[in-house]
């Protein structure tokens, strides 16, 4: 018996919702933009093999890999429930660039924990599993935030509420929006991107942030796409993180002049996103970004839609 789970890329913050808003995305051409994890019956308590395009960027030691730590916390939770942990042989297919702003660590965490849970016949419920995912994300980034793991696991656009035992809630979005995702091929560690932010903000920035986020959520629920797009503004992180992203300002300006409804930094960068409601505009922006924002062979551009499913089983073998 074995199971393979795919976990999609995600946009943390979506510009307007620092640490509280996230969206899962998948390319419209059907290609997989995310990590996969296989869990199979093992002869030892735990073994891990790593494959994929970005396997060279992973720690050499198994004990330093986040998938190993996912197994440890999963074992801890099963022990609390007096449920037997099965010996497992795990394989991580690392397709996501690390430090990309696409929720790379979340992809590995979500795929690993979802696959472990399915392999053990779902002993943990959705909220319990999501809490573990947040714990693992905090281990990597240094702070607890669900804006990548929640959409990666649950799909769609997710708003983090973290009250009444509820971690996140889905937000209705717009079916005709395309999301152009451009990764330049350089690395921006989340911890470094957080360190550059100020410890205090001006009152007018706090007011603006509340207005934009409240306006965006309201516009999504009332299905006003033009208003929602106007609200996608970041006064918390983008003004400070721009300096870490070569060419971002010019790329955003081009995207907006070319017809994008909104454009911003995905997560802590360096990936940027541009929202379009016209496929030809999205493709034109994608071509320009490939020529002008991508810096090396590791970079890429995808025209995406929101991934409404989140993590999912893709078979029993990689």
Curated annotation (Swiss-Prot):
Alphabetical list of PROSITE patterns matching this protein: GHMP_KINASES_ATP
Entry's Gene Ontology molecular function annotations: ATP binding; homoserine kinase activity
Assigned GO CC terms: cytoplasm
Annotated compartments: Cytoplasm
Xref: InterPro entries: GHMP_kinase_C_dom, GHMP_kinase_C_sf, GHMP_kinase_N_dom, GHMP_knse_ATP-bd_CS, Homoserine_kinase, Ribosomal_Su5_D2-typ_SF, Ribsml_uS5_D2-typ_fold_subgr
GO biological process: threonine biosynthetic process
Associated pathway: Amino-acid biosynthesis; L-threonine biosynthesis; L-threonine from L-aspartate: step 4/5
Pfam families xrefs: GHMP_kinases_C (PF08544), GHMP_kinases_N (PF00288)
Catalytic activity: L-homoserine + ATP = O-phospho-L-homoserine + ADP + H(+)
EC class (word): transferase
EC number, as in UniProt: 2.7.1.39
Binding site for ATP: 97-107
Keywords for the protein's UniProt record, in alphabetical order: Amino-acid biosynthesis, ATP-binding, Cytoplasm, Kinase, Nucleotide-binding, Threonine biosynthesis, Transferase
Origin superkingdom: Bacteria
HAMAP family: Homoser_kinase (MF_00384)
Primary role: Catalyzes the ATP-dependent phosphorylation of L-homoserine to L-homoserine phosphate.
PANTHER family assigned: HOMOSERINE KINASE, HOMOSERINE/4-DIPHOSPHOCYTIDYL-2-C-METHYL-D-ERYTHRITOL KINASE
Family of this protein: Belongs to the GHMP kinase family. Homoserine kinase subfamily.
Protein name per UniProt: Homoserine kinase
């Amino acid at each position: 018996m074995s199971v393979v789970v795919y976990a999609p890329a995600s946009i943390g913050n979506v510009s307007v919702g620092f640490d509280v808003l996230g969206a899962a995305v998948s390319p419209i051409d059907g290609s997989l933009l995310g990590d996969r994890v296989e869990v199979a019956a093992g002869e030892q308590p735990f073994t891990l093999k790593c494959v994929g395009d970005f396997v060279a960027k992973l720690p050499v030691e198994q004990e330093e890999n986040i998938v190993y730590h996912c197994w440890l916390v999963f074992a801890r939770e099963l022990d609390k429930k007096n449920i037997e942990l099965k010996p497992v042989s795990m394989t991580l297919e690392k397709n996501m660039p690390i430090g990309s702003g696409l929720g790379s660590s979340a992809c590995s965490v979500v795929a690993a924990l979802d696959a472990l849970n399915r392999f053990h016949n779902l002993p943990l419920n959705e909220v319990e599993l999501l809490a573990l995912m947040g714990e693992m994300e905090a281990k990597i980034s240094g702070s607890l935030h669900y804006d990548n793991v929640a959409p990666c696991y649950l799909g769609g656009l997710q708003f983090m509420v973290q009250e009444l035992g509820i971690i996140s809630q889905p937000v209705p979005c717009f079916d005709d929006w395309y999301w152009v995702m451009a990764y330049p091929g350089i690395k921006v560690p989340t911890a470094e991107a957080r360190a550059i932010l100020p410890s205090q903000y001006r009152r007018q920035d706090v007011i603006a942030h509340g207005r934009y986020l409240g306006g965006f959520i309201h516009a999504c629920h009332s299905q006003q796409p033009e208003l929602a797009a106007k609200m996608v503004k970041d006064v918390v992180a983008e003004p400070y993180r721009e300096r870490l992203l070569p060419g971002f300002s010019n790329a955003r300006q081009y995207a907006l002049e070319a017809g994008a409804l909104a454009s911003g930094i995905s997560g802590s960068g360096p990936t940027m996103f541009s929202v379009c409601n016209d496929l030809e505009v999205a493709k034109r922006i994608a071509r320009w970004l490939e020529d002008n924002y991508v810096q090396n062979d590791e970079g890429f551009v995808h025209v995406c839609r929101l991934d409404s499913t989140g993590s999912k089983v893709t078979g029993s073998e990689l």
